[in-house]
């Protein structure tokens, strides 16, 4: 199974002042997909604490996917991208762009998210916003991508046609000769 780490970044949640609804939404999504929630933690908005967990989960536990929630906005304490950026070896900008685009369908404020997506070793790391709506938007984007992405990172060769596209007897060439 795909092994997932869920890291909530929130001063309020880490202090026990607020319920971690966004992390709970990710856990529910992981279960609904049949993935394994291999690690879950809540940390304050501190670069060192965030980076420490990311390093452990990517390098030691070698999780397939790490989803962070929170700390991606413009506020002075929002530092999740700053903690993530130095640790990822390769970017996956299309994922972060797609998450922002999905959010923009519902609120213009989604454009203010600075969340990143990238790869460390064989782990895909994705920063999601802290709001439950932002998390749901992000999970909608990740849903059709995760298994293919993890397969590629594992060195497997999954089929390249996404569900409902080409394959299954359909011609990938439009307007070509009969």
Predicted regions mapped to residue ranges:
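Non-catalytic beta/alpha edge segments that cap or flank active sites
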Residues: 1-178
